[in-house]
Amino acid sequence: MKRTPSTDSNSTSISNTRRTFLAATGLSALAAASKALAREYGPGAEPVRYPDPDIVVLDKRFEKYKIGNTPIQRLHTGMLWAEGPAWNGVGRYLVWSDIPNDAQLRWLEEDGHVSTMRRPAGNSNGNTFDWQGRQISCEHGNRRVVRYEHAGDVTVLADSFQGKPLNAPNDAVVHPEDGSIWFTDPGYGILLNYEGNKADLQLKEAVYRIDAKTGKLTKLTDEIFKPNGICFSPDYKRLYVADTGASHYADAPRNIKVWDIVEGTKLGKGREFASMTLDGFEKAGFADGIRADTDGNVWASAGWVGDGYDGVHIFAPDGERIGQIRLPEICSNVCFGGRKRNRLFMTGSQSLYAVYVEARGAHVS
């Protein structure tokens, strides 16, 4: 005799109850996951359980750089778009830009005090220091690269090329052997009045070099859509530049490029160093500011994708992604600082973050 399934009201009720329970369980799991992602960093936040789950090892080569008993810390918040962190080893402070607010801020290592260091600041973006301890800044608003002298006056290092104004210098590094300044000019600062003064680009986006002795400005390459973050390898034989051209060019890659440095002043042919595509995400984000450590790894700010992606991506010298530092905001730039240059400072949209790592910055920041 064939048995037919029961269709009485009790069975239906049990089935509905089970479905309701499973649905509720699923929602609870999603809520828990969302809560886990929505990490609190404010003064009243509970301390994170070690090891910090947002310092992620993707490859065993990153294990030695992750410290088990240190947290990612938010040092300050309240900016509109934080950028350009740079460490001053003599003054023991970090300077960074808040571009839309036209200000440079300073964080003191001794007590964590934050103050406005310079305002107006030319809508400055990237900052660094030369080997004489003088601050170099890339100004969106004035479309130039400047140096702040010890006496307080400002020296304009570059504001035009071949008779045309620069677009909006973005980030810069200083070469130790000859003091030359290498910088990127993607033009983001003139696209809107929000971060500078709106205007048309008169030059192709490019990477430049300023000769420290003569002041001569040389174009190194324009074989890149929108050159952004920039850094040298530890031996100064290679130059890395982040390409964020996909923000405005449909056929632009989302990657970091590398060039061999020829005769100390020129670049060979560029090639892809690392892709910003990450397994498990439908789209790739952007690398922005980048810095190298003494082992040749490249630490790249990353963002514009969302939770689990935004933060810092760490690439080994062969271009393989080996680790992540996840942040609750888009990360715009990074630098190494602190007494041992083993503290990674990260500007994350509206906030400043820091974390100790078992790596040391390769250069003056």
Sequence positions of predicted segments:
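A short loop-to-beta-strand structural motif that recurs across blades of beta-propeller domains
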Residues: 103-105, 144-146, 206-208, 255-257, ...
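Blade-edge beta-strand/turn elements of extracellular beta-propeller
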Residues: 65-77, 113-120, 151-163, 210-226, ...
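Beta-rich, blade/repeat-based domains predominating
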Residues: 77-92, 120-139, 144, 162-181, ...
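N-terminal secretory signal peptides and thylakoid transit peptides that target proteins
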Residues: 4-28
